[in-house]
């Protein structure tokens, strides 16, 4: 079997090891198991998790302070959205190769459990109907399922038009609400929104606004990349 990341041959694991690590573990060779820059080892923005030269609030977040829709308390990102991050998103989200999830599951699960211990209900950010028709699977719920952590689907996507990945930065910043809270759902006190990439922050801020409007008191977010 060839490594999904580098294309080199992957040594076959012993049967008991394959069972313990999961069937997909050996799709990635030992040299490619940790391909990303971990942001926790570097100075980042206090609010969005962006890579910085020193720990402070970045210019983008300072602008969000002036926007009434900005009710998100904080975003935590695991990895920098660099070449390796873009490669992961291409394989996972656009090619649809879910086996590549193995390079993020361990760290993602650890971070999710920390939020659960703090009383946060995990809520995946839903994909648009157009994206679902193309991919045929929900990326974030699929990740959460593999992490074996409970999550609640509180939101549905009601937006139309271009996918986020196809929009310009200016288009993403045009704040038109693409989410609504599902009917007959309980109102948690604290919600953690989970998404793949934080770019301008517009999508997550609007999701947070939809939740606070029904009475959620605290909304934070966790993304794979920033």
For the regions a protein language model found, what residue spans apply to each?
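Glycine-rich phosphate/pyrophosphate-handling loop used in enzymes and phosphotransfer proteins
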Residues: 1-226
């Amino acid at each position: 079997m060839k490594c999904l990341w580098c294309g080199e041959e992957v040594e076959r694991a012993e049967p008991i090891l394959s069972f313990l690590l999961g069937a997909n573990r050996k799709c990635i060779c030992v040299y490619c198991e940790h391909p990303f820059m971990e942001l926790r080892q570097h100075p980042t923005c206090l609010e969005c998790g962006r890579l910085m030269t020193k720990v402070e609030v970045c210019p983008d977040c300072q602008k969000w302070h002036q926007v009434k829709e900005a009710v998100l308390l904080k975003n935590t990102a695991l990895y920098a959205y660099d070449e390796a991050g873009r490669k992961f998103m291409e394989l996972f989200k656009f090619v649809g190769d879910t086996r590549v999830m193995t390079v993020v599951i361990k760290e993602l699960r650890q971070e999710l459990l920390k939020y659960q211990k703090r009383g946060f209900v995990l809520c995946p950010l839903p994909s648009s109907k157009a994206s679902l028709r193309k991919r045929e699977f929900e990326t974030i719920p699929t990740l959460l399922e593999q992490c074996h952590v409970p999550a609640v689907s509180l939101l549905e996507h009601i937006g139309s038009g271009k996918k986020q990945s196809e929009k310009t930065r200016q288009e993403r910043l045009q704040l038109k609400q693409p989410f609504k809270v599902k009917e007959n759902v309980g109102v948690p006190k604290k919600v953690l929104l989970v998404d793949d990439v934080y770019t301008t922050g517009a999508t997550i801020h609007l999701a947070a606004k939809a939740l606070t409007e029904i009475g959620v008191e605290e909304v934070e977010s966790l993304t794979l990349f920033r």
